[in-house]
Every structure is written in C-alpha cells, then in structure tokens.
Amino acid sequence: MRLSIERSALLKALGHVQNVVERRNTIPILSNVLMSAEDGQLTLVATDLDIEVSEITAADISAPGQVTAPAHTLYDIARKLPDGSQVVLQINADDRLDVDAGRSHFTLPLLPSGDFPKMTADGFTHEFSISTKDFSRLIDKTRFAISTEETRYYLNGIYIHGHAGKLRAVATDGCLLYTSPSPRDRQKSRMPSSA
C-alpha cells in the first residue's frame, strides 16, 4: 500500500474515527484503525465492538492495500504536522507503516488487517433515513436522561424506535424517562384543546 494525502484531509478523517478507539485496550487490534486504499479513496474504520465508525476521504493511491495502524499515534502525528503538507503513507519492507511529510519521518507497527473485527449490517430488521441535523437534535434532546451508573449498564444508551414512518428516541436512568419524537412527529402532532 502506498498513498499520498493532504494533512488536513487525513486529520479530519482520523479525528472522526479515533474517538471510538480507547487508548488502552485489552484487545490490541481495537487500538488500531483499519485503512483501506483503493480507487482514489482512503477508507478509515475504527470499532470498540459496540460502535463502528468509518470515514472515506480522497487520496492519491499509488499502490492499493489494507493495513491497521495505531489510531491515536497516527492521529497525534497528523495533528502535529504543518498545515498544507502532503502525507505519504506506505508499507515498508519490514511490514511497518512509514509516515512521511516533508522532513518528518515516522515508522509505526502494524497488525494484520485480517484480524480487524468486521461489523456487518446483516440481521438488522429496521432501517431509517434522517438528516444529520435532525438526528443530532434527536440525540441531543434525549441524552440527558441516559444513566451514567456502571452498575446499570443496560440503561447506558438511547433506544431508537421507528414505526409507521415516525422515529422516537427514548432514554432513562431509572428515575427519569424521556421520549423525543422526530421532527416530523412534532410538525404533525396537535395538542387537544382544553374542554
């Protein structure tokens, strides 16, 4: 694998996916980001086995390939490189990732890309489409009710339910229960008049 990418594009893509990766992980491959280079695109994938985030960005691909490299280390390198620099990523003869930008040179260890866990969408029974703005608003209005207690891990999330073209987000901490209708629900709903 060999590619060239602008520092800002790499930093933006890594910034999105590295948030899922924990710095210290008992499963080493989960500390890495999967990088796939082909057809003029670099795809970055990170997971913690609960969430998977992928980001696609344009890159000049000289040799296609797929590797996994330490996510936070690569992000820190990209963050400290000068603005406007071209970053060259390539696998060297020792099966390590060389990161070159101007006079800077880094070599990172790799793990086999075949060991990276793949989350598939097979088996999901529901699918929905919503704008990023509306989805963000739906989550933001609901997340205050999420439990933060480690002993009640089953309440540490938001339940999203779609039915008959409507989407609801529900969260509870055991004391509070909040349900947020989708923006489409709010536009259609009417409060009954007082009698």
How would you label these PLM feature ranges?
Residues 183-185, 189-195:
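Positively charged, low-complexity/disordered segments
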